[in-house]
Amino acid sequence: QCPVCRHAKGKIKQKKISGNERFIRVQGSPDLTVEDVLGDIDPIKALQYGPLSVEAFTPGKLFKANNGILFFDELNRAPEKLQNALLQVLEEGKATIGSYDVDFAANFIFIATMNPKDVSTEKLSDVLLDRFDIIYAGYPEDEETEEKIVLAKGEKIADVPANLLEIMVSFVRSLREDKELEKVPSVRAGIALYERSQSTAVVAGRKEVTIEDVKSAVISVIAHRIELKPSLRYIKGQ
């Protein structure tokens, strides 16, 4: 029960919750705290009204996800302390907030994402990973699928001939398969190249993208998205 229901007197009005409201999203980051996700308890008001009273307890996103879906994006960016708190909730159905042991109705579907190659991330413990079934999602298998993604996600402000879109996507995919690169461009690179080449055309007063627009956009779009392997950086630097 939530604090309102627990301390209510008499009948409580019911409210239907839509599917969208049952989907709770949490964005992982190093500064995310246990209080952000689990909730916070005001110690002074807790002494007066009780730790789970409406006055003392501020529910976090995990509490709001009960009987719904908790989607945690970039879980491995969350600090270790928060990961341990989540583990306690998933395993025991309760959590420690401050100096209080709180019973949580942890009845939700927990979905999380992570990019194992990213920097500035925390290692997920084997115990926490054991709570998940893991699905590895790679890049689009074929060029046609990637082109559809670029068209669906990219903003359109000028006409892009089909052959130029094919060139952009093919170029990005060729870099992705380059054995000399340690860091390769994602699908976002294709979307950025698609949008940047259009911007170049519009600034030049044209309504259709040319191959020159694509070429001029390549460096600003691709340069920071690729990186040579360390051994090759050393050799090429000599």
State each model region's role.
Residues 33-39, 106-107, 121-161, 165-170:
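Conserved AAA+ ATPase core "coupling" helix
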Residues 154-201, 205-208:
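Conserved AAA+ ATPase small/helical "lid" subdomain
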Residues 202-238:
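C-terminal engagement/docking regions of AAA+ P-loop ATPases
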